[in-house]
Each structure stands twice: as C-alpha cells, then as structure tokens.
Amino acid sequence: MSGLGVERLGFVGFGEAAFHLAKGLREAGVQRTVAFDIHMHTPGLGEKIQERAKETQTGLVEFSAALAAGADVIISAVTADQAVDAAQQTVPYLTPRHMFADLNSVSPRTKQKVAEIITRSGARFVEIAVMGPIPPKFHKTPMLLGGAAAPDFKEMFASYGTRMDVVSTDQIGRAAAVKMFRSVIYKGLEALIFECVLGASQYGAEARVFASLAENFPGIDWKKLADYMVGRVVVHGERRAREMDEVAHTLEELGIEPMMASATARRMDWAADLGLRDTFGGEFPKTYREVLDAIAKSSAFEA
C-alpha cells in the first residue's frame, strides 16, 4: 500500500469533515470510498448523509463489518464524544492489513485510548490533528500526524496533494496536543472578538476599538478578523464548545484550572443557543454586522 496511494478508503461517520475529505480525495484520484454512519437512517440527518454519499460516489454500508471488508484505510470522523465508541465498534473487524486513523478533535489521552483499542487487532493506528477548516481546502487542509504508522500514512496520501506533517512516531497524543492547546488561543480569540463587538456595537465604538488594536498589533486587519471569526462562531458554536470542553478536561488532567478554556466554551455555547445557524442556512455570514443584526431581530439577546 505504501507509496501507491489508497485503493479503498473508508470513513466511520460521514458528516461535514468526512464528506469534504471524500470529495477532495475522489477528485484527486482515490478510486473507491465507503462509509458507515449510525445516523444514515435518522430522519433529517439520514437524507443529508445520503446526498453527500451520492455526490462523492461513496458507498454507504449498514454495518462496521462491511466497512472493514470494503476498506484498507479507515478514517474515524465522528463527534468527539463518539471517538472511543467508534473505535470499539470497528475493532472486532480489523486485521493487520488495516490502517485506522482518528481525526476527531479529542484530547491526547483519548487519542491514546483509541490507539490502544485499535492496535489490539493488529491494525496500525495514526492520529490526525486537522489544523484548519476542511472546506475550502478539502483534503489539502494542513494536518499533523502521529504514530509509528504516520510516515507510511503520509506517503500513501502524498500523490493526492495532501499537506501532512509527521510530528511524532513514538508518542500518540502529541499532534492532538498541538491542536488542542492552539485552540486556547484561537478559539479564545474568537470568543474575545465576539464579546468585544457585542459590547462595542451598543455604543457604535467598534471602528475605534479596531483602530486602537491595530496600533498595538500592526499587520492585523481587526475588522476583517471580526467578520471572519464571528461568523464561524454562530455557525459552528456547538462543535467549538465541545472541543473547548475537551481542552478544559485535558488541562484538569494536568492539574491546571481551565479558566480561559471553560469561559470560551460558555461563550461558544451561548452563540450556538442563538440558533443563527439555521438563520444563515448553515452558510457563513460575510460580516459580523450581519450577525449582530440577526441577534437584534431575535428576542434572545442577553449577552
């Protein structure tokens, strides 16, 4: 398999991340993709999964056994709270010919737990930390890899134009740690900017705030950054909140009180509870003003 590409690629979970990866990889030359998703028959979600499968010519299977039979490389792309369960449900059907990669946004210790589960079967394990939003770059989104099989995994996908960097071959969890502790800054900044414009807009003070910030942090277009970040928060607040819960849990395991991580999760949950994802049809608003206007039209404004 190494160096020859991927003949049969499988996905556990076929949500947004898996769909966009499959789309990019199919267009880049992967010949066969299959997926198993526990929600494939759930009203509402099931129809979306089937539409995505049709668009990417991905075969949907009914059981984990069928997924393992139809794929050599399997990527787990489920919600963070389902990562361990997904591994446990798949491992009975894995053999030494399989490679199982976990790209879920979970803690380093959860990655280690998944690795322990998977390697019992003789299958090889790779941890993946996705270092940016998968659309619009699809499979070319930067990713960090970890695990003894990481170099082979990178080589297998290289011909498709992927951007993968191996950060460790002897320690599972390092790639996840890079992403996780970067999130303290990145998602913390999203929460800070959202809270800033929520307050500043009540006095028409945003432009002055941005100008003042630009003096102290030259090179950053703060208005543009606010437009970008606020839109992402209202569309993906729920997912971001759960990721920050994982960060907080990891910090607690290390004996560090997660003051900032927990506060960020609260603001993300607040944003998700506004229900603006549906207002914008799941698409990102172009400016933070669109978000503030939508909030003002609702009766739920209580920052």
Tell what function each PLM region has.
Residues 1-69, 94-97:
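NAD(P)+-binding Rossmann beta1-loop-alpha1 motif at the extreme N-terminus of oxidoreductases
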Residues 12, 36, 76-77, 128:
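The conserved SAM/SAH-binding core of class I Rossmann-like methyltransferase domains
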Residues 65-125:
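Rossmann-fold NAD(P) dinucleotide-binding segment
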Residues 106, 110-187:
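Rossmann-fold dinucleotide-binding core
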Residues 178-284:
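Helical "substrate-binding/catalytic lid" subdomain
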